[in-house]
């Protein structure tokens, strides 16, 4: 039988419900239920599962307890509000005030604490998580059987699984770790979002290495401000969550974190910060990749190559090499493995149909990331730079004007368009972006165009491109759908860009 959701281990020992009750410090329900899995999704329940019925913004997971029971749930983890409904369904219940806060530890127990048998490297930061995770996994492959968990996909060996979110829920994450252990995986590179840290998705995880890339305004619809955002990230650098930190001291929040972290910290700098333990030197940035020398704390000189363009990818590559060295890999072997990574989906991903201009798709969807990628492309563009950009709906509204200003300032042609409008009016989002673009003085501003339709915007940018120019389509990267008014329709920037180029090629 095929079940929805991420994979689960084939072999698992049952855990008595009474043992889980004892772990929670609550009275054991009547009966002798045995638990062989856990899920927070009533649709993904398997026989023998503990169904975590969590309170939500609109609905309570206990509303679906009858469905869970019908699929074979053996018991329920819930709060007092959900306990009565669980009893009505005839299921024994573990009742705690905050079931989400206890879900991770129970999942780890049920699956036999699989994370303890894996070398775990977690990466957090506003930008660079995905790229750094791919580079770390590439380096790990030189010495170990690997797994990858992140925004684009999850990988167990050569099996690829589409990701629902950057960091899976704790129930799914512990199951993934158990599958990795069962299949002989030795090490995993994983993105850790601030949401994951705040919402308990990485509860029961203790990362061998925790990497901090940078911090800039993002997710302000979730965090109360930058201090709250920083404190969320800083949780990863405590003994409860990691054993060693690898921190970028080119970033102001990284410098603060290096001082405030309560685990040992190794620092790195792509800009040659004299106090950093590891530094990038002799950096040569090219149109497709960069080379540099890594200087280590013991006089190491390591030849390194970033397989991706841009100074920011020098920083990501350095982060990966330092993390791998901190994990005990030979630094030069690690650097060679990182250099061999073929690319990262949707991160400065080139689209080449033989056209006489450079065309790339990138996930940049924050002001600093947009500026960074435009600056990097400007350095390697002989002609003009044409950029397509939108802002997502139902997300941080404060970044819309700054992003409009950034693309207008750093591109010769700024084509403003829809991203994922979700429930918002696309034209209202574009109007705010246009205000930002208009705030840039005329002598510093490129030509600004507005197309509500994203495919039309991409076609317009391609139509303007001449030999030696660059076309950047930013914001969605690897995504393969566009959310408009709650309906997700197929849309892949890479494919749409490819088709637009083909049409110009005749």
Swiss-Prot record:
GO MF, one example: magnesium ion binding
Alphabetized Gene3D superfamilies for the sequence: Mur ligase, C-terminal domain (3.90.190.20), Mur-like, catalytic domain (3.40.1190.10), MurE/MurF, N-terminal domain (3.40.1390.10)
Top EC class for this record: ligase
Catalytic activity: UDP-N-acetyl-alpha-D-muramoyl-L-alanyl-D-glutamate + meso-2,6-diaminopimelate + ATP = UDP-N-acetyl-alpha-D-muramoyl-L-alanyl-gamma-D-glutamyl-meso-2,6-diaminopimelate + ADP + phosphate + H(+)
N6-carboxylysine PTM positions: 233
GO biological processes: cell division; cell wall organization; peptidoglycan biosynthetic process; regulation of cell shape
Span of the annotated motif Meso-diaminopimelate recognition motif: 419-422
This protein's UniProt keywords: ATP-binding, Cell cycle, Cell division, Cell shape, Cell wall biogenesis/degradation, Cytoplasm, Ligase, Magnesium, Nucleotide-binding, Peptidoglycan synthesis
Modification after translation, per record: Carboxylation is probably crucial for Mg(2+) binding and, consequently, for the gamma-phosphate positioning of ATP.
Cofactors demanded by this protein: Mg(2+)
EC number: 6.3.2.13
Keyword Hydrolase attributed: no
Binding site for UDP-N-acetyl-alpha-D-muramoyl-L-alanyl-D-glutamate: 42, 166-167, 193, 201
Pathway membership: Cell wall biogenesis; peptidoglycan biosynthesis
Binding site for meso-2,6-diaminopimelate: 395, 419-422, 475, 479
Function: Catalyzes the addition of meso-diaminopimelic acid to the nucleotide precursor UDP-N-acetylmuramoyl-L-alanyl-D-glutamate (UMAG) in the biosynthesis of bacterial cell-wall peptidoglycan.
Assigned protein family: Belongs to the MurCDEF family. MurE subfamily.
Protein name in the entry: UDP-N-acetylmuramoyl-L-alanyl-D-glutamate--2,6-diaminopimelate ligase
Gene name, Swiss-Prot/TrEMBL: murE
């Amino acid at each position: 039988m095929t079940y929805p959701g991420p994979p689960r281990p084939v072999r698992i020992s049952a855990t008595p419900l009474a043992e889980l009750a004892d772990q929670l410090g609550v009275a054991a329900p009547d009966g002798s239920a045995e638990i062989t899995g856990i899920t927070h999704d009533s649709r993904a329940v398997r026989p023998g599962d503990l169904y975590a019925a969590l309170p939500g913004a609109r609905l309570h997971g206990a509303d679906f307890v009858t469905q869970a029971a019908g699929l074979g749930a053996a018991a329920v983890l819930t709060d007092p509000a959900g306990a009565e409904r669980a009893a009505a369904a005839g299921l024994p219940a573990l009742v705690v005030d905050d079931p989400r806060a206890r879900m991770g530890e129970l999942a780890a127990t049920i699956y036999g604490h699989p994370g303890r048998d894996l070398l775990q490297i977690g990466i957090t930061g506003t930008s660079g998580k995905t790229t750094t995770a791919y580079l770390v996994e590439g380096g790990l492959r030189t010495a170990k059987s690997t797994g990858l968990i992140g925004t684009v996909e999850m990988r167990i060996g050569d099996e690829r699984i589409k990701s629902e979110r950057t960091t899976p829920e704790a129930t799914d994450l512990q199951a993934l770790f158990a599958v990795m252990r069962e299949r002989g995986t030795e090490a995993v590179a994983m993105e850790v979002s601030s949401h994951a840290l705040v919402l308990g998705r990485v509860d029961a995880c203790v990362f061998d290495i925790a990497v901090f890339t940078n911090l800039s305004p993002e997710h302000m619809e979730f965090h109360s401000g930058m201090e709250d955002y920083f404190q969320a990230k800083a949780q990863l650098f405590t003994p409860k969550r990691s054993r060693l930190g690898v921190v970028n001291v080119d970033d102001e929040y990284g410098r603060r974190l290096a001082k405030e972290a309560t685990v040992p910290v190794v620092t790195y700098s792509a800009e040659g910060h004299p106090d950093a333990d590891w530094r990038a030197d002799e950096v040569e940035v090219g149109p497709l990749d960069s080379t540099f020398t890594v200087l280590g704390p013991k006089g190491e000189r390591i030849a390194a190559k970033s397989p991706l363009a841009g100074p920011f990818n020098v920083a990501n590559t350095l982060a990966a090499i330092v993390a791998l060295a901190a994990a005990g890999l030979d630094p030069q072997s690690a650097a060679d493995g990182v250099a061999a990574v073929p690319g990262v989906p949707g991160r400065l991903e080139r689209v080449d149909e033989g056209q006489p201009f450079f065309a790339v798709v990138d996930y940049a969807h924050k002001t600093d990331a947009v500026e960074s990628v435009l600056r990097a492309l400007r350095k390697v563009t002989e002609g003009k730079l044409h950029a397509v950009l939108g802002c997502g709906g139902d997300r941080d509204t404060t970044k819309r004007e700054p992003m409009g200003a950034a693309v207008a300032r750093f591109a010769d042609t700024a084509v403003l368009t829809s991203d994922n409008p979700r429930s918002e009016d696309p034209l209202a989002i574009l109007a705010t972006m246009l205000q930002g673009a208009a705030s840039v003085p005329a002598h510093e501003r490129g030509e600004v165009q507005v197309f509500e339709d994203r495919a039309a915007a991409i076609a317009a940018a391609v139509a303007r491109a001449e030999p030696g120019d660059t076309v950047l389509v930013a914001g969605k990267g690897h995504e393969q759908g566009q959310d408009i008014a709650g309906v997700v329709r197929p849309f892949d920037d890479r494919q749409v860009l490819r088709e637009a180029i083909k049409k110009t090629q005749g």
